[in-house]
Amino acid sequence: MGQKINPFGYRLGITESHRSKWFSDSNKVGERYRDFVLEDDAIRKVMNKDLERAGVSRIIIERTRDRVRVDIHTARPGIVIGRRGAEAERVRAKLEKLTGKQVQLNIFEVKNPAIDAQLVAQGIAEQLTNRVTFRRAMRKAQQDAMRAGAKGIRIKLSGRLGGAEMSRSEFYREGRVPLQTLRALIDYGFFEAKTTYGRIGVKVWIYKGDMTEREFEEQQAQQGNNRPGRRGGDRRPRRGQRAGQRPTGQNQVKTGPDQQMEAEVSKEAAVEPETKE
């Protein structure tokens, strides 16, 4: 099962989160679930086409009632922003025309592109387009990923490799890539190289390590804390958690989309219960 299915969808809700974050149960035209799905697909196609040279890793879309938030994770943020933000403004205006809503565009830089599967696949495809031998391109990508800290990498090329008349597939692997293990952090990327002989498909799997039980519990707790409680506020404390008792968990303060800072709950914040005479 793990060998065939998409690694991202296989681990969705376990080690991976959704890349389209919204909910719709409306029957109104333009606000239905299928309308939003088609709109998300159109947004991603436009972004990948206009920012093909920017090295876009992933696009995350969030929706509210009258606003669409688009987060772009790229290895070359300067190309996306442009001179004095002209390119970013052009992309935002194009998305507003497509969606008919106000668009908030956020650009994030990928710190280590050598272990980002989508960027590695794009890099191999660019080399194949420039007529670099496929074995050299695969070997260089493997060496760069392992040197950058990956625990394993697997690359598959399919098509008319080297201009051969009959298409074939070739695998290259280094290290461990446990596709069946759910707690394994597997990054997956796919890209097509357009060569003079036709298209060559590039698939990349990168193994970055296992998610520990503590990290999994922290992720689940964070997802639970992000859900709004009653009247838009936080949920009431449990019956056993009275005033004066220190909670067992930790408050997580978000400092960015890819970073988290944990703050311990101080004992001085506890309030002693009042006694009636």
UniProtKB/Swiss-Prot annotation:
Annotated region described as Disordered, given as residue ranges: 216-277
Pfam families, A to Z: KH_2 (PF07650), Ribosomal_S3_C (PF00189)
Keyword field: Ribonucleoprotein, Ribosomal protein, RNA-binding, rRNA-binding
Keyword Repeat: no
InterPro entries the UniProt entry points to: KH_dom, KH_dom-like_a/b, KH_dom_type_2, KH_sf_prok-type, Ribosomal_S3_C_sf, Ribosomal_uS3_bac-typ, Ribosomal_uS3_C, Ribosomal_uS3_CS
UniProt keyword Transferase present: no
Ranges where the KH type-2 domain occurs: 43-111
PROSITE patterns, sorted: KH_TYPE_2, RIBOSOMAL_S3
UniProt-recorded Gene Ontology molecular function terms: mRNA binding; rRNA binding; structural constituent of ribosome
Gene Ontology terms: biological process: translation
GO CC entries: cytosolic small ribosomal subunit
Basic and acidic residues biased stretches: 264-277
Subunit details: Part of the 30S ribosomal subunit. Forms a tight complex with proteins S10 and S14.
Job of this protein: Binds the lower part of the 30S subunit head. Binds mRNA in the 70S ribosome, positioning it for translation.
HAMAP family: Ribosomal_uS3_B
Similarity remark: Belongs to the universal ribosomal protein uS3 family.
Protein name: Small ribosomal subunit protein uS3
Organism: Bifidobacterium animalis subsp. lactis (strain AD011)
